[in-house]
Every structure is written in C-alpha cells, then in structure tokens.
Amino acid sequence: MGKKGKVGKSRRDKFYHLAKETGYRSRSAFKLIQLNRRFQFLQKARALLDLCAAPGGWLQVAAKFMPVSSLIVGVDLVPIKPLPNVVTLQQDITTERCRQALRKELKTWKVDVVLNDGAPNVGASWVHDAYSQAHLTLMALRLACDFLARGGSFITKVFRSRDYQPLLWIFQQLFRRVQATKPQASRHESAEIFVVCQGFLAPDKVDSKFFDPKFAFKEVEVQAKTVTELVTKKKPKAEGYAEGDLTLYHRTSVTDFLRAANPVDFLSKASEIMVDDEELAQHPATTEDIRVCCQDIRVLGRKELRSLLNWRTKLRRYVAKKLKEQAKALDISLSSGEEDEGDEEDSTAGTTKQPSKEEEEEEEEEQLNQTLAEMKAQEVAELKRKKKKLLREQRKQRERVELKMDLPGVSIADEGETGMFSLSTIRGHQLLEEVTQGDMSAADTFLSDLPRDDIYVSDVEDDGDDTSLDSDLDPEELAGVRGHQGLRDQKRMRLTEVQDDKEEEEEENPLLVPLEEKAVLQEEQANLWFSKGSFAGIEDDADEALEISQAQLLFENRRKGRQQQQKQQLPQTPPSCLKTEIMSPLYQDEAPKGTEASSGTEAATGLEGEEKDGISDSDSSTSSEEEESWEPLRGKKRSRGPKSDDDGFEIVPIEDPAKHRILDPEGLALGAVIASSKKAKRDLIDNSFNRYTFNEDEGELPEWFVQEEKQHRIRQLPVGKKEVEHYRKRWREINARPIKKVAEAKARKKRRMLKRLEQTRKKAEAVVNTVDISEREKVAQLRSLYKKAGLGKEKRHVTYVVAKKGVGRKVRRPAGVRGHFKVVDSRMKKDQRAQQRKEQKKKHKRK
C-alpha cells in the first residue's frame, strides 16, 4: 500500500515563507503585489473596497501602496483582525444588509478600486464548486457596479470552467479593457485566474439580467446547420485576362524596366527583359547572371528577383549621372558665344532637359523613399532598444524578488552610529551653512521615534565584553583570560575619564542640547552600569557582612576541633617523635594547603610550646639518635604506610583528608556494582589479589616496561560493555554542556545582537517612511544598515589543516574536509599571537 505524502507541507512554497518573514497575513498578498506591478491601479486610488478580505493580506498591501489619507474598507463573513487606517465589516456580500452597511460607511463616496479574492467552501464536485465561485464573482460585480466610480477598476478571481466565458462577456459590456492573467504567486496546479477590468463605463442603467445567474450562465443551444446552408448560393465573378491582352508571354525592354514606377509589379507581369541598349549592356553591373535571369523571369526565385531590382537601381544611378554631365556640357557650350551652334544645341538641350528633369524628380523621389526607409529603420531600432531595456528591467526585478530585495517589510541594519538624519554629524557652522534644504518635519519625526531611555555607558565596556566573549568561547585561552582579570578593573577605572572626554566632545557641537541635567544623566548611567548581569549576584552590604562573620565563626570552630583531636593523640606519641614530626620537611611538604594546613600547623606549634619545658637536656642524645633513624624516611612518600624504627616506636603520620576523585566510566560502572550487591563487592575485592598486580613504585621500573605491562597484563573488569557505555554516554552529555562562563558569554552575545537588531529595525523604519528619497536610495541605505550592524551574510566557515613537514606549498584537499580550508603551521600561529600582543600593547599605550 502506497504511503500518502503530506499535503500541507508541500504547499509551503517560497511565497508562504516570504509572507511569514515580511509580516503579511497570507501568501495571496504577493498576487496583488504582482498584479499592481503590472497594471498600476493602487497608486492612483483614493478609495478601495475589498470583498472577501479575510484574513487581511490584500488590505495590508492596499494600505502600503495607496496614498496615506485613502479610505480602505474590507468585508468578509468572518471577523478580520484590525489593521491601522482600515475599516473592516463582518457581512455577507450576497445580502442587502451588506449593501446598506457599505452605503453607511462610504456615505457619498465612490471607490476607485474593487477587489474580490473570494472563493466558496470547496469539497463537493468540481462542477458545483466552479459554479459557486462564478456565482460569488457575479455578486461581487453587482456590488462593484453600485459603488465603483467612472473609470474605476475591478479585480476578481475566477475559476477556469464553462461559466468563465459568460463572465468575461459581461465584464466586456461594463468595462473598456478586460484582461485575464495569472500572477507568478498563484500556484500552477490551481485553476484560478485573475481578471483585471479597467475603465468602468458607469452606465445610467444596468440590466438586472446581467446579475441573474440563471440568465448569465444559461446554456445556449446552437442549432446545427444543414448541408444546404453550408453551400454558398452566390456564384463567384469570373476573372479572365486583361482586355486586349491575347498572349501570356510579355516581352519588354530594359528602358521600360528603368522607367517603371513600381518595379515589383512590372516584374510580376513581364516574361522577358530585352537588353537592347548597347551602352547598358556593356555596363559592369550587367553580368552574365543578369542576362540569364532576364531571359525568363517567371521561373526566378526571391534571390534572383532581388538581384534584378538591385541591377535596376545601379543602372538608374548611372543614367542620372550621365544626364547631369550632359547638362553641364550644354551650359558650357551656351556660354561660349557660338550662336549658331547654340541654337542647334538649344534645340538638342530642349530635348535633353526634359529627361534630365524627370531624372531629377525620380532621384528626389528615391532620396525621399530612402529617407523614409531610414526613419522606419531608426524607429524599429528604437523600439527594439526600449524592448531590451524593459526586458532587462523585468529580469532585474525578478532577481530582486528572488533575492528578497524588493519586498515590503524587509529591513537591513544601521548606516551610522547616530542614524541617518542625526544632527550629530554636523560639526561647526561651516557644515551648518551647507545644509540649505531639507525636510525638517521628516527629521523631527525620525528623532521622535528614537529611543530616549537607551543610555550607553561607554564603548570601552563593549570592547571588553567582546574580548571576554572571544576568550570564553576559545577554551585554549581561558587560562590567559583568568590571569589578566586586572585589565577589566583598569578599564572600569578609566570609565569616568572616557565619559568626561565624550561630554567635552558633545559640548563642542553647538547644535545638540541635552534633554536632562548632568547630575540626573550621571545617576541614570550609574544605575544602568550596576544593573548588568555581572552585578546580579552581589547582595547588599548587610548580607555580605553577615556572610563574612559566619565564615569566620566556622573557621574558628574547625581550628578548635583539630586542636582537641591533636591533644587526644598526644599521649600515644613521644615528645621527640612529635618534635621530629613537626620539624620534618616530609610532613611540611605533604601538609594540606589552605585553611586546614594553616590550622594544623598552628596546632602543632602550640603543642610544641607547651611541652618544651618538660624536655631536659639529658635527652639530647636520644633525640639525635631518633633524627638519625628518621633520615632514611625523608623524601619518601607517605603512601607506603607506617614505619617502625630501631627502638620499636611506631610513627603514625597525620592523615590527609580524603581527596575528591573523579571516576571514569569504568570506575562508575564498578561503583554501581559495589553499591548494588554485597556479594559482588566481596567477589570484586577477592579478585583484586591476582598475578597481574604489583606494588612497585613508578620510579623503580623502566618506563617501557610499565607501558608494556599496561598493554598486555590487564585483567578484564567484571562489568559489561553496556554498563560502561551507559556511563560513557552520561559523561559525553555532561561534557557537551557548556561551562558557566561560556553560557554567560553566549547569553551576552545574544542580548547584544537582539539590542542591535531592535535599533536597526527602528532606523530602517525611519528610512522606509522617508518621502524625500527614491526607492533605489532607500534600498542602498537599508543595505548599508544591514552591513554595519553585522546582520548580513554569515561568515564563511574555514577548516584549518595543520601542514606537515616536507609537503611543500601545494596541499591537496584532505579526506573528509568540505568547503573552504586553510593550511596552517605552528610558526604561523605564533606569529599571529605575537601580532595580537603588539596590537594590545598599542591600544593600552593610546589609552
């Protein structure tokens, strides 16, 4: 049985995600955006009526693209969530009550645009759903005819069905232009199309049958025509030959061909062209191919006919040039004074001037035709150029839409530290004089939208946070950061100096006036500083004093308890042994650190002072012998257990407090076995005595021997792999958790990013609402805002590969490494760290 796919997720295309990102309530908003981009009906509209408007995506688009003071009304069966500057009604568009509510809301107004994106509840048969949608469209058209102004537009959704053509015919009776289109945002598998009707005729009276679905969608039966009706009764007029033309073969001369007004018509009637003029026959243009073509014109093709027309043009130019030369020669002969010859030449010139004038007229006509042809060619080239430009703009627009650059609501980030139109960029009177024009109301609006409660203490703290963030996120440099915690205190001490410098800079600007007094501003800055997360764990002074007193009391109780314990052990240990124990460097080295070590030392010294009087000088030899017996014990570990000297006294060292030991997964598994069963614990202890155990110190055996023994002489633990893997998995989960400093650093980074994003959003809204600049400038400014706020493209992930010796400069891609990688070595790392240290020193010197 086949598995049914998820229908809902497949419908979440790019327009669905774009609607989520840009804040539109439905993906159908992009359909209206694309329709308006093509037909431009929202920019000029002052009143709009949206039928079946829920959930309000088309109302959002209309409010964005229409003028600010426009009237927008939305109607639907279900309630619509309120929108700014939009009136919503919950009515049924097929009832008279809805018409009355609209009249009450619009009063005497006529709307310029009526939108209809309604569709009935589908689920029945396709024929029934299509008819219901066509009926709903007809009702929407009825409301549009009641409230639409002359020349208005009606945009509606229609399903492709058998009722589509009747609807289209009704639209054409009421509007000048009716166009059907399918925007890109409409799904290809959907049967919906959008009809844009422009130029409402506003007739004085509309026939009510137009809005009656029984009449509008009535099927017209076309009567079938009979065979006799299909046969034409009128006899066509007989077409014969021209009057007086008794032959089909027409022979003409080349002179007639040159004098013909329409050479194409001449060639269609001629059968042969005779080259009877010897001078024209000897012309270079009269080739052998031309002679052959002139013999039988009826069999020529397009190429040969074009060659004959070109041949005619060349001969006409040759004849015109020859006639001009003859005319000039006649003028010269007339000016020579030979009257007799002049009379004769006049007669000849009279006969030749007439053809020369005719040739000039023909030449002028030819030049005129050539000029017209050139003008047509220029017009065609201009149209092609405009078409290419339009196609290029459309392609760029599609690319911008695909890249989410030309969508409403998409804002990028900051252009500067103080905003786009802030007065802090003007320093001095010289720059003030340059600002001669500007929209001061827009600037005041922008400044009023800026947050006044956000106070920045200093940029030094932000730099310090960035440094600590980098160190927190880099585990290798955690130790270095802990050693340089004093730098933060120094930066905080310099905070007041930096703020004083900033106040001096602000006082230099004559255009900026502080809104609050200096004392109030300093108090707010101090409160903001101590409200940071780093001071959240600090309590009041009273709680701190109480905590310190409790710690001191606990310390005194522990010291007294240790002194009493030493006094109880004192009778079991001779004074000489106690003295030796106190003076021995072995126990001084092995004493625990911290408060316990100090308390133990103080207790021992106190006991030594009390027993000092009871020790006589006669015991000096005994003490010297005891010191000699203690010499072999110096430098050895206390873990070897208690030792006995020659006199038989047992020396009991001070026991170390139990050290906290972190168990590995095998140790945790063994601990679980020990804690769960006494028998398993007993067996485990018995099995610990085996031939694999040895008690030699690490220094007594060679290192290679110890390594080999660890590898080959290991007894298997009495725990299963599943238990060990369980604790190993728990360790991995614990290690995967970030430490507290890393978590705090990430939280600080996220908080700063959100704050930066909020500031960027406000500045971007101010840029979008500015009327004085073009859309292209707005996009450029928004892009720069994104770039400066660091909200643009993410940084490319680079994989670092450690270079090996002897490989050379060219390194192939290692196995398992994808994307961009960089080859590094230890020398490069040291050089980079040295460079960073130098830069840090330079920064400290500047401060």
UniProtKB/Swiss-Prot annotation:
Q: What is catalyzed by this enzyme?
A: a ribonucleotide in rRNA + S-adenosyl-L-methionine = a 2'-O-methylribonucleotide in rRNA + S-adenosyl-L-homocysteine + H(+); a ribonucleotide in RNA + S-adenosyl-L-methionine = a 2'-O-methylribonucleotide in RNA + S-adenosyl-L-homocysteine + H(+)
**A matching Pfam family:** Spb1_C
PTM entry text: Citrullinated by PADI4.
Query: Where do the record's region annotations for Disordered lie?
Result: 332-370, 457-510, 558-653, 811-847
Residues the record lists as Citrulline modifications: R392, R783
Give the transmembrane ranges: none
A single GO CC term for this protein reads:
preribosome, large subunit precursor
| Phosphothreonine found at | T573
Stretches assigned to coiled coil:
355-407, 739-777
Q: Where in the cell is it found?
A: Nucleus, Nucleolus
The UniProt annotation places S-adenosyl-L-methionine binding at G56, W58, D76, D92, D117
Q: What is its EC number?
A: 2.1.1.-
Residue(s) of cross-link: Glycyl lysine isopeptide (Lys-Gly) (interchain with G-Cter in SUMO2): K357, K579, K643, K659, K678, K710
Q: What is the effect of changing K31A?
A: Abolishes RNA 2'-O-methyltransferase activity
Q: Which PANTHER family match?
A: PRE-RRNA 2'-O-RIBOSE RNA METHYLTRANSFERASE FTSJ3, RIBOSOMAL RNA METHYLTRANSFERASE
Q: What is this protein called?
A: pre-rRNA 2'-O-ribose RNA methyltransferase FTSJ3
Gene encoding it? FTSJ3
